[in-house]
Design a protein with these regions (language model features):
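Soluble "head" domains of membrane/secretory-pathway proteins
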Residues: 8-9, 28-35, 39-209
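Hydrophobic membrane-insertion alpha-helices, especially the h-region
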Residues: 7-25
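N-terminal Lys/Arg-rich, disordered targeting/topogenic segments
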Residues: 1-3
Length: 209
């Protein structure tokens, strides 16, 4: 094949690959509905799960969780893992203080995320024994086989505060691609970080799970 003939063939191959990729994204992806994960994810975004990642959770990853409530597929962020102790302290001046003690040992640290700081305005403490909201903040232990999850837009997210602990067995995959972008792209923003807890908010220890 001459170079003149090779160029159209290569271009045709590239077009075919692009078409196949588009079909794959449309067929295999999950469409985001609503704004509970804004600004990280927006309504209409398409997500592709990591192959073979069903039943996996890693701290601060985004996961696709099949909820027992109306069998809905949720897209949320993993915050607490089995054995962790978790609480949310809510005050008028600081309504969304997410506190975490990894594996129930060591210091209680604050989980901070820019979307939470920018968007959280409503007050509400956590956690009750099942991981939902509570009248006062209490550190609760995440049970075996479960995890604590939140949306990046706290005021508009139905997450563990509403539904309780998530079941790892019902995780259908970790989010691996968004509209063809890798999850580490700056477009998705930085992951939450653990910082030294400051301020007067101090959750009660809680009786355990």
């Amino acid at each position: 094949m001459t170079a003149r003939r090779a160029v159209p063939a290569v271009l045709a191959g590239l077009v075919l690959l692009c078409l196949l990729a588009g079909v794959a994204v449309t067929t295999l992806s999950v469409r985001v509905e609503g704004s509970s994960m804004a600004p990280t994810l927006r309504d209409g975004d398409r997500l592709l799960p990591v192959p073979g990642s069903a039943g996996e959770v890693h701290r601060f990853d985004l996961v696709l969780l099949r909820s027992r409530h109306q069998n809905a597929l949720l897209v949320k962020r993993v915050v607490g893992l089995p054995g962790d102790r978790i609480a949310i302290v809510s005050t008028p001046d600081d309504p969304f203080q997410v506190l975490l003690q990894e594996q129930g040992r060591g210091p209680v640290r604050r989980v901070t995320a820019r979307p939470w700081t920018d968007q959280a305005r409503r007050t509400g403490n956590c956690c009750a024994a099942d991981g939902t909201r509570s009248a006062r903040p209490e550190l609760r232990t995440v049970p075996a086989g479960a995890f604590f999850y939140l949306g990046d837009n706290p005021d508009l997210s139905d997450d563990s505060r509403a539904y309780g602990w998530g079941e790892i067995a019902r995780v259908e995959g970790r989010v691996g691609l968004r509209g063809g972008l890798l999850p580490t792209s700056p477009d998705l923003g930085p992951a939450p970080v653990l910082e030294t807890a400051r301020g007067p908010g101090s959750p009660a220890p809680g009786p355990g799970p």
